[in-house]
From Swiss-Prot:
Task performed by this protein: Component of some complex with histone acetyltransferase activity. Required for the function of some acidic activation domains, which activate transcription from a distant site. Binds double-stranded DNA. Binds dinucleosomes, probably at the linker region between neighboring nucleosomes. Plays a role in chromatin remodeling.
Boundaries of every SWIRM domain copy: 359-446
Protein name in the entry: Transcriptional adapter 2-alpha
Zinc finger (ZZ-type) residue numbers: 12-69
Gene3D superfamilies tied to this protein: 3.30.60.90, Homeodomain-like, Winged helix-like DNA-binding domain superfamily/Winged helix DNA-binding domain
DNA-binding region ranges: 429-438
Gene Ontology MF terms: chromatin binding; DNA binding; transcription coactivator activity; zinc ion binding
Positions bound to Zn(2+) 2: C31, C34, H55, H59
SANT domain ranges (all copies): 70-122
The UniProt record lists the keyword Hydrolase: no
Gene Ontology terms describing biological process: chromatin remodeling; regulation of transcription by RNA polymerase II
Ranges where the record places region Disordered: 345-375
A Pfam family recorded for this sequence: Myb_DNA-binding
Protein's gene: TADA2A
Organism encoding this protein: Gallus gallus
Length: 446
């Protein structure tokens, strides 16, 4: 009867919720990793991630409910248990009292269901036979064959292998009994208290003894062996290999949090590192998706093409040198002379931008109309005027501005040659953008 009562619908028959101590009603949650006794939570405490002692919010769980059919589509598991309880209370054949106790089924339904599924059902007979055979098989189990293990290493205490294993002795399956501060007694082994010592010498000897006691106490309270055992710090190379699988940012965090490992438990410490590693991966993935979105990419097929083209552009940018820029103007002597004069101006310092006379006789292009162009609302009036004069769309200007500002922050200043290396557009437009950003205080000249 006690076994059946644990499945009843009466909330007073079940333990209360461990979070709010309220009586549990179905459905409720049972932790699959904690217990016995079972760790039960109501849905409200489960949704807010209640944790208590060893129970964590990320444990696996089970939804406890009996509102589902088992033997008959019209009978729920809760009604099946209620029928069995009623038969045990009222006796077999007293179907009227059984129906009155159940309150949901008639006398005929209770009798028909019980006789069909519990008396005349061959499933239960075969189940009992299988249980009996399984019980007999447990007593006839053969012995498990054991094979001799490999001979464990036995390094000497002062060897390099022993230091790498933190003094662990595999043959004895325990750490060495020698202390990490094994030579602390050497400082006081020759101290001798005599009656004719001066007060200063006597106080000095007492201080040395106190220092020894403090070192001994620190060795005892530090619990180095316990930390080594709990965190599994036996194989140092194994931990170094595990650290290398993290990105550099997580490795720096791992190195910083190593000193706090003695405060946190081994599981909590690993969870902390893994959670930050997952956070870093999510941030990097979000940044990558934001880059795709800013480029107008809406599917991963286009994203693969974008990544391939971006990698190609980066490789070409690294191959570019000053010689390649000269070769662009080698066929036009006047253009080459202008480029050389601009490079000379870079070395001599900033000069007011002077219009370069054009021999082509062509008229200058009209200002660009920014109406309706994306990114215009992000510009101030001076930036809009600049984009109109150099005929540069706002989106491209914002991208060039961000690249120049970031490079200036990294280098502590920016030269015009560096700006031209970053922005592969007309050198005259680059010069105007560079001068404008310096004049407005966005960047500083190196």
């Amino acid at each position: 009867m006690e076994r059946l009562a644990s499945f009843g619908n009466d909330p007073f028959d079940k333990p209360p919720c461990r979070g709010c101590s309220s009586y549990l009603t179905e459905p409720y949650v049972k932790c699959a990793e904690c217990g016995p006794p079972p760790f039960l939570l109501c849905l409200q405490c489960f949704t807010r991630g209640f944790e208590y002692k060893k129970h964590q919010s990320d444990h696996t769980y089970e939804i406890m409910t009996s509102d589902f059919p088992v033997l008959d589509p019209n009978w729920t598991a809760q009604e099946e248990m209620a029928l069995l309880e009623a038969v045990m209370d009222c006796g077999f054949g007293n179907w009227q009292d059984v129906a009155n106790q159940m309150c949901t089924k008639s006398k005929e339904e209770c009798e028909k269901h019980y006789m069909k599924h519990f008396i005349n059902n061959p499933l239960f007979a075969s189940t009992l036979l299988n249980l009996k055979q399984a019980e007999e098989a447990q007593h006839n189990e053969t012995a498990i064959p054991f094979h001799p293990a490999d001979d464990p290493p036995r390094p000497t205490f002062d060897s390099l292998l022993s230091r790498d294993m933190a003094g662990y002795m595999p043959a004895r399956a325990r750490l060495s009994s020698r202390s990490f501060d094994n030579y602390a007694e050497w400082d006081l082994r020759d101290i001798d208290f005599v009656e004719d010592d001066s007060d200063i010498l006597h106080a000095l000897k007492i201080a040395v003894v106190d220092i020894y006691h403090s070192r001994f106490k620190r060795e005892k309270t530090a619990g180095r062996k316990k930390i080594i055992r709990d965190h599994g710090l036996i194989n140092l190379r194994k931990f170094q290999i595990l650290e290398r699988r993290y990105p550099k940012e997580v490795q720096d965090l791992y190195e910083t949090m190593r000193r706090f490992a003695r405060i946190l438990g081994p599981v909590e410490h690993d969870k902390f590192i893994e959670s930050h590693a997952l956070e870093f991966e999510l941030r990097r993935e979000i940044k990558r998706l934001q880059e795709y979105r800013a480029a107008g990419i809406t599917n991963f097929c286009s994203a693969r093409t974008y990544d391939h083209l971006k990698k190609t552009r980066d490789e070409e940018r690294l191959k570019r040198t000053m010689l390649s820029e000269v070769l662009q103007y080698i066929q036009d002597s006047s253009a080459c002379q202008q480029w050389l004069s601009r490079q000379a101006d870079i070395d001599s310092g900033p000069t007011p931008a002077a219009p370069i006379p054009s021999n082509s006789g062509r008229r200058s292009a009209p200002p660009l109309n920014l109406t309706g162009l994306p990114g215009t609302e992000k510009l101030n009036e001076k930036e809009k005027e600049l984009c109109q004069m150099v005929r540069l769309v706002p989106g491209a200007y914002l991208e060039y501005k961000a690249a120049l500002v970031n490079e200036c922050n990294k280098q502590g200043g920016l030269r015009l040659a560096q700006a031209r290396a970053l922005i592969k557009i007309d050198v005259n437009k680059t010069r105007k953008i560079y001068d404008f950003l310096i004049r407005e205080g966005y960047i500083t000249k190196a």
